[in-house]
C-alpha cells in the first residue's frame, strides 16, 4: 500500500508544479518518476495476482488431495467393514468345522471301541470254538452211534425227518414239531434206541 501513497504524493506534487508553472525539464523528470512508479505498481500487481493464482492452485490441489483422502478413507472403511463381516463368517464356519471335527473324533472313538469289542468277541468265539466245537462234534457223533439216526437237514422248517437204522430194518422218521410237543418228540426218538447190551467182541 506504500506504493499507492507514493503515487498520490507524486500526483499532488505534479499538480502543484503544473499550477506553479515550473520549468519543463523538471516536469519531464517528475513525469518519468511517475511512469516508473506506475510500472513498479503494475509489476507489484502482476506479482500479487501471480502469487494469488499460485495460492489458489495450491489450495485447489490441497482440496483435491483432501477429497481423494476422504474417498480413500471411505473406501478403507468399506473394506474394513467387509473384512469384519468376512471375519465373522469365517469364525462361524470355523466354529462349525470344529464342532463337526469333535463329532467325527467322537464317532471315530466309538468305532474304535466297537472294533475292539468285536475283536474281543471274536477272540472269545475262537476260544469257545476251540473247546466247544470238538466237544459238540464228539457228542453228536456219540449220539449218532447210540441212536442210529441219519437226519435230513434239508427238510422243511418245523419238520423233523430222518432214517433210523434199527437192528433189522431202517425206519423213516417224519415228525411235525408244530403239532407235537417237544417231550413227545424226545420220548419217541429215545424209544427208537436199542437198549439191548451187546458187548464188543
UniProtKB/Swiss-Prot annotation:
Region (Interaction with the NDC80-CDCA1 subcomplex): 1-69
Phosphoserine carried by residues: 11
Location in or out of the cell: Nucleus; Chromosome, Centromere, Kinetochore
Coiled coil: 21-132
Interaction with the C-terminus of SPBC25 as annotated region, ranges: 132-197
Region called Interaction with the N-terminus of SPBC25, residue ranges: 1-131
Keyword Coiled coil among UniProt keywords: yes
InterPro entries, per the entry: Ndc80_Spc24 (IPR013252)
Gene Ontology cellular component list: kinetochore; Ndc80 complex; nucleolus; nucleoplasm
Name assigned to this protein: Kinetochore protein Spc24
Lineage: Eukaryota, Metazoa, Chordata, Craniata, Vertebrata
